[in-house]
């Protein structure tokens, strides 16, 4: 179990990656307590002085001008949680819920939300007990925050809704019992503070970021393997080429290929005097394409790290000034655009991989047996595996359409521009799965091509990459049931097996 001490506003991408992959034991820096208490006191003072402040003693959305009597304030907070828990579809994975809750704890504990520490402590206890609220994946437009997902999270604090514990669906009341908690009566503003925020969108987008990083590492390894299998040149990775263009991520991408391919190899030496002048773009332009993808990954990482540590509640309590101010930090446009950029990178990584794989099975280009199998005609080899890769690449092109350019007014036109960040982040999971499938096919093809180059060997790192695959998948000597081979290669990549072959500091969270 991963241990994390939350210092509000200081979560790193490396910490968030661990949280997304492992059950987590949480603690909260005690220095956060004073700010939370002071913030909650400011809210209490509003009630005491009978002021009218949005979110504390008013309705919500279009009903913001409706004043709520003091006797109804507890009911108001409970009602907003229950009424807003209106999501639909399959439940989020436990890992996504865990990440979302931790992001919410990080935001609330900064002391700008007027929420009591006991509410945050309850969220911590849910995570520590591995009790995860059942949260439908669909139902948020990413402004005013992720209302429905966060409402489903919050229902469990009231002893309502459902949760998942050890893969079983249980009631909210049972969930509290397991976590050693009792139902919470929410104080003024606490329901709204729990619901307002970008944490669902950000959790989805962060998972997409971490997947994109893993895919980038895998694709670089597969691409280097394909260079060797196709008897490609190392010259396109020469640092001088990339230095004069000036893009740092392109230079770093080229460095990664040099790191993998080394200065030469037996395979490389075997074709130094060949007649080929230039390689096809899918081999030669890898630093340019992958460098551009790396830049999008890095840009998105910067945005998402800021958002993960942000306060996206509304209204905000500025205790030092005694002010409670309404704004729009719940609008997840930065998250949506970051996710859209990740979608472009994930799609392009897969698209380039599919082209390399297509090159390998083309004997005219690769000088390998047609479809990478002996006795062609009797054997079809990798023929239909490439069709599968093409289908996945094409599907990703549709999914890569930017979500952030879409908007549909809600709440009787009070919330008249929204980000669609939740979908922008959520679809990254499907895209990553598609690209991983494409890479799995290329990995099999590249390893097959390298084996056909025997007894000549590639560089040490490429040989390590091939041997890791060969521990699971044998050489394809004749036609056999192909799907299990793809599944095994896919599993290898899903485990991020090749991340350790990358240069350090290349990817933001690694």
From Swiss-Prot:
<dbReference type="InterPro" id="IPR005921">
    <property type="entry name" value="HutH"/>
</dbReference>
<dbReference type="InterPro" id="IPR024083">
    <property type="entry name" value="Fumarase/histidase_N"/>
</dbReference>
<dbReference type="InterPro" id="IPR022313">
    <property type="entry name" value="Phe/His_NH3-lyase_AS"/>
</dbReference>
<protein>
    <recommendedName>
        <fullName>Histidine ammonia-lyase</fullName>
        <ecNumber>4.3.1.3</ecNumber>
    </recommendedName>
</protein>
<comment type="pathway">
    <text>Amino-acid degradation; L-histidine degradation into L-glutamate; N-formimidoyl-L-glutamate from L-histidine: step 1/3.</text>
</comment>
<feature type="modified residue" description="2,3-didehydroalanine (Ser)">
    <location>
        <position position="144"/>
    </location>
</feature>
<feature type="cross-link" description="5-imidazolinone (Ala-Gly)">
    <location>
        <begin position="143"/>
        <end position="145"/>
    </location>
</feature>
<dbReference type="InterPro" id="IPR001106">
    <property type="entry name" value="Aromatic_Lyase"/>
</dbReference>
<keyword id="KW-0456">Lyase</keyword>
<dbReference type="InterPro" id="IPR008948">
    <property type="entry name" value="L-Aspartase-like"/>
</dbReference>
<dbReference type="GO" id="GO:0019556">
    <property type="term" value="P:L-histidine catabolic process to glutamate and formamide"/>
</dbReference>
<dbReference type="GO" id="GO:0004397">
    <property type="term" value="F:histidine ammonia-lyase activity"/>
</dbReference>
<dbReference type="GO" id="GO:0019557">
    <property type="term" value="P:L-histidine catabolic process to glutamate and formate"/>
</dbReference>
<keyword id="KW-0369">Histidine metabolism</keyword>
<dbReference type="Pfam" id="PF00221">
    <property type="entry name" value="Lyase_aromatic"/>
</dbReference>
<keyword id="KW-0963">Cytoplasm</keyword>
<comment type="similarity">
    <text>Belongs to the PAL/histidase family.</text>
</comment>
<dbReference type="GO" id="GO:0005737">
    <property type="term" value="C:cytoplasm"/>
</dbReference>
